[in-house]
Amino acid sequence: MLKQMFDQVREKSPLIHNITNYVTVNDCANMVLACGASPIMADDKEEVAEIQTICAGLNINIGTLNSRTIESMKIAGTRANELGHPAVLDPVGVGASTLRTSTANELLKAVKFTVIRGNISEIKTLAVGTGTTKGVDADIADRVTEENLDEVVAFVKRFAGRTGAVIAVTGAIDIVADAKKAYCIYNGHPMMSSITGTGCQLSALTAAFVTANQEHPLEAAAAAVCAMGLAGEIAHERLTPQDGNATYRNYIIDAIYHMDGNELEHGAKFEVK
């Protein structure tokens, strides 16, 4: 299943419209290229509807919000829905400020998202209006562990049912779920948290995967999360004592570039609940 998801990305090379944050925009573009898709980074309200029309999927990331891009996100999201394009929302830091929270909620009302990806604190904030967001990282009280895994899976499935979206909760244990089925994913490496933007890259990667596999959004999102985690493992094995987080970031992108469906199929670590 995972092999097919990745192979479809390489075969179809979908064009993905990214309205993302300026901290990680270059990394997101390179991640989309590395997986075999193509990126466009456009965020002016005068062109986003037109750009979305020529694309096949949309990735919206609220990491560096401003009044100009908020309007652009709504326009692009509405156009994506009109065209039947998959849309991914990355609600970076929702709950940390009133602007982020209100914008994320407005986007959820205005746009039908295929996938919503965030850490557990961000997803909790969207789902119940509360959470313990501190910046863009999940508070220790909100971490997914083996002990609370079943409880979190049930919560994520409920939120998926309410939104109609696949929900991807990423952390030490990743959960990707729709209302009925959840993938609990164990790929990744702790050093990935030392890089700014691995989550942003994953959302861009997810947009490419779900766009190339529109009939299987749950499996496509799970494949993207597995691929990113596996890339983190492969990249870490390459590091020398002189290397740091900048080298690690590049190695993760390289790992996706060289990865194929067979490697993903054999390297993925997950269980289904």
Describe every region a protein language model picked out.
Residues 28-31, 203-210, 221-224, 252, ...:
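Buried hydrophobic packing segments
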Residues 69-118:
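Glycine/small-residue-rich loop that forms an oxyanion/phosphate-binding "nest" at active or ligand-binding sites
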Residues 31, 35-84, 89:
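Active-site cofactor/substrate anionic-group-binding motifs, chiefly glycine-
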Residues 196, 206-248:
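Conserved post-catalytic alpha-helical subdomain immediately downstream of the catalytic base
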